[in-house]
């Protein structure tokens, strides 16, 4: 989302650990030079994470996944992505995620969450693998806030009907809830990343055999490509875009004295505002960081859904809103299906999204884009794919199906919901209107032609449209270092 140019030393960006006891003051070495504050996880833990075999964080691919991100036209790329095969040392488990940063330090926040969330989740899974007493010792249900209490009650309701869920789901849900809680605390205590008006979204997918668990914070999105009874490829949205105008989200924000409204020049974009100040105008209801709004209804509690995979399910697309702002779910699914190979599928989606930005928002600079494609079908190829980072192949199993979600706003996904926690997937039939030059199923334009258009070619589109910024302004009581007029370049 927004862009940032920080004076922080580049080595700071590589630090990815908890800092609850790290000193926040600058220490002096005997030589008289200033020394940076120590970070608890800046040493062995981070080196261990970076050396994990099967972990991809940059543009590349493996036998079961591909990743691609492209910087927008406003500076530093604030999107981050992750594929971690053999997660928790399980050959049947894969963790995928995309993270969309915003604000002055958004690029640092998104990378921090990308690096530390899997590490913390792995630790929590080992801790909560026992009985309910172990989760009690972890503090998940001790002295909860009103937000945690709502989520915990929802979890307890799920436990009353365990027949709907496999054995792995509830421990994983507990671990993911606790992980996000700890992740936000770690960001608040970080000595070098100022998260007061900076944050990130997060969409994580954990695939374990036939089971799929999706955790969502913010407005990034996960979409499943599957086949219907006629063997036609359809898109099923696995997450809800957690915007401030959702009824339950808006109600919570108002209870906490925050405000939700849209500006006159962008009436379709609801934003979160401080009670007595027209700032910061955050365009999402949940996020890591953004502590200026945490007392006014913004939360970092993930919306967690469960899905049972079937043999008809083909692949999952995770992407930031730089993609979904200009492409529909069905269009993204069709682009991946039309890609020359699995290795280029994620790049094909990003390239098409960049072209669509030029068409849909000709007066604005395109947003950062990040895409992760996780393929669910088995591959018969024997060798591994050459990539920029070494990865292991984890065998994927074909599966059978039921879709279950605990979200309160499932109607916003246009799903037919029942009184239980079971929902019917959304089969996207209607496609958003897109320019004919970039329509995937156009009679005259192929995918290859669409993504090969020259940059200097003239574009025709609606005039007067502007891109949506995640964050509009910095509160007046923000730290003096960032209150200069130059902050606008970060939005």
UniProtKB/Swiss-Prot annotation:
UniProt-listed InterPro entries: PP2C (IPR015655), PPM-type-like_dom_sf (IPR036457), PPM-type_phosphatase-like_dom (IPR001932)
A Pfam cross-reference name: PP2C
Low complexity composition-biased segments: 17-28
Disulfides per UniProt: none
Superkingdom field: Eukaryota
Sequence positions that bind Mn(2+) 1: 100-101
Record's keyword annotation contains Hydrolase: yes
Annotated segments matching region Disordered: 1-39, 391-422
Record's cofactor remark: Binds 2 magnesium or manganese ions per subunit.
EC number: 3.1.3.16
Recorded family membership: Belongs to the PP2C family.
Name the UniProt record assigns to this protein: Probable protein phosphatase 2C 6
Native organism: Arabidopsis thaliana (Mouse-ear cress)
């Amino acid at each position: 989302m927004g862009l940032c140019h920080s004076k922080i030393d580049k080595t700071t960006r590589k630090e990815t650990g908890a800092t609850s006891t790290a000193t926040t003051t600058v220490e002096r070495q005997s030589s008289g030079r200033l020394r940076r504050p120590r970070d608890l996880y800046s040493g062995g833990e981070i080196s261990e994470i970076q050396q994990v075999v099967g972990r991809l964080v940059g543009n590349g691919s493996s036998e079961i996944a591909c990743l691609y991100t492209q910087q927008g036209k406003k500076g530093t790329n604030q999107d981050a992505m992750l594929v971690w095969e053999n997660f928790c040392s399980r050959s049947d488990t894969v963790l995928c995620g995309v993270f969309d940063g915003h604000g002055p330090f958004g690029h640092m926040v998104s990378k921090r969450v990308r690096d530390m969330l899997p590490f913390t989740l792995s630790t929590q899974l080992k801790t909560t693998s026992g009985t309910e007493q172990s989760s009690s010792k972890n503090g998940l249900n001790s002295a909860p806030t009103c937000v945690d209490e709502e989520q915990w009650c929802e979890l307890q309701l799920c436990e009353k009907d365990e027949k709907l869920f496999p054995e792995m789901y509830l421990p994983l849900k507990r671990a993911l809830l606790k992980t996000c809680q700890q992740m936000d605390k770690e960001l608040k205590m970080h000595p070098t990343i100022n998260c007061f008006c900076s944050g990130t979204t997060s969409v994580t997918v954990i695939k374990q055999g036939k089971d799929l668990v999706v955790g969502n914070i913010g407005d990034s999105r996960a979409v499943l490509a599957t086949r219907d009874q006629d063997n036609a490829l359809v898109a099923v949205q696995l997450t809800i875009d957690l915007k401030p105008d959702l009824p339950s989200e808006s109600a919570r924000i108002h209870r906490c004295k925050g405000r939700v409204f849209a500006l006159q020049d962008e009436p379709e974009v609801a934003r979160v505002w401080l009670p007595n100040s027209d700032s910061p105008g955050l365009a999402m209801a949940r996020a890591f960081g953004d502590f200026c709004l945490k007392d006014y209804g913004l939360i970092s509690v993930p919306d967690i859904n469960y899905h049972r995979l079937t043999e008809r399910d083909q692949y999952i697309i995770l992407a930031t809103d730089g993609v979904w702002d200009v492409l529909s779910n069905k269009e993204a699914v069709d682009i991946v299906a039309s890609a020359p190979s699995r290795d280029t599928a994620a790049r094909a989606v990003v390239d098409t999204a960049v072209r669509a930005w030029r068409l849909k928002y000709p007066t604005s600079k395109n947003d950062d884009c990040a895409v992760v494609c996780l393929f669910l079908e088995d591959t018969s190829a024997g060798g591994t794919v050459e990539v920029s980072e070494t990865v292991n192949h984890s065998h994927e199993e074909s599966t059978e199906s039921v879709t279950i979600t605990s979200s309160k706003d499932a109607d916003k996904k246009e799903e037919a919901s029942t009184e239980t926690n079971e929902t019917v997937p959304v089969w996207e039939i209607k496609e958003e209107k897109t320019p004919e030059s970039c329509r995937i199923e156009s009679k005259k334009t192929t995918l290859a032609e669409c993504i090969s258009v020259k940059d200097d070619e003239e574009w025709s589109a609606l005039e007067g449209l502007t891109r949506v910024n995640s964050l509009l302004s910095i509160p007046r009581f923000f730290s003096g270092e960032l209150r200069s007029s130059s902050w606008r370049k970060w939005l």
